[in-house]
Structure formats: C-alpha cells, structure tokens
Amino acid sequence: VIYCGSMGDWPLLSDEERQEGVARLVKARIPTVVGTGAINTKKATDHASHAQKVGALGLMVIPRVLSRGPSLSAQRSHFASILNAAPNLPAVIYNSHYYGFSTRADLFFDLKKEFTNLVGFKEFGGAKDLTYAAEHITSQDKKTSLMIGVDTTVFHGYVNCGAVGAITGVGNAFPKEVLHLIDLCKKAANGDSLARQKAKELDEAL
C-alpha cells in the first residue's frame, strides 16, 4: 500500500489520524510505503520517523508544497531532513513540476552521496520528464530504480525508459487491468511484439 500519497487526501487528515493509519496497516502485516507530504518540513520528518518506528517498508518523499517552491537550497534541506529522519527506510524521491519545483539529476545525486537510503526516483511530470529521468538519473546509476507516476505513461516508462514499477491512480479503480498492462509492458520491453501491440492498446484505453 502507498499510504497518503499525493492523491491520498492527506490534507484532510490530522497528523494523529495519518500516523494511526500507518500503525494499523503495519500491525495488519500489510506492506506499507508511507507518503511524507506535509505543509512544512517538521511535519514531514515526524511522519518519516514514525514510519520507521512502527515498521513501515519505505517512504515517498515529495518537495515542499506550499512555500519556497523554486528555492533549490530550501528543497534540498527539506529532502535531507526527511531522509535523515528515517535512515533505515528505503526512500523514493517524487518529482512533479506541479509543486513549483523540478528535481533534477544534480540535486538527486547530491542527496544520494549523503543518504544511502535514497534508492529510487518517481516521475510525475509526463513523458518528457520520464525520458529525462531515465537518461540523466537512473541510467547513470544502476542501483537507482525508476518509478512511473503518471497513469498515461506506463507503456512509455516500461518500454522506453527502463522503469521497474508504476504507482498509479487508475490502479486503485482497475487493479487487475493495470497489473495486466504492466505484465504486457515487461514482455514488450523484452522484445515481444504481440505484447507490445496489446500493451499500447490497453495503455491508450486506460
């Protein structure tokens, strides 16, 4: 479960409610990756440290969303604080220019030098940004995983960019169809022409 991701209505929950949800999921033995989106860095780091304390499996880390969006130094400090708050949890940095800030390769690798728990990059900016991430981030470091974040770029991400996972909104409504699409995309990436045709059709339909 990706809990309290960007589309997970976390602004509607109190901090206590969010953390109670994490604890309940972990207690129920459901693998849980925790979104750390918050209105300030202090709250984001609190969610990260709580996730590690109760036994979550990982973190999703997004930029500051309400202030100092374009500031590189502010965003680096924000990312670093979250990664430092849960050093034992693998973390994926989430890029989306909709937050007013684009995470690029220089910042990502600067953080990765300091934080070994930074293991992945999720791209939500669309096909062009996904291509950028593949060319300048994940292809430069084989230990960094590329995750797809836009429903309409699943085929492009797997087949053209070497993505290893997809975190989608449509998957909540059509889980079987999205899993089937991903299976077809993996086969297409390995050269299966029939799977490629079917994957493109299903990708466009969804």
What are these regions (language model features)?
Residues S81-P87, S96-L206:
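Catalytic alpha/beta core domains of metabolic enzymes, predominantly
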Residues V1-S102, D110:
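Active-site beta->alpha loop and helix N-cap motifs at the rims of alpha/beta catalytic domains
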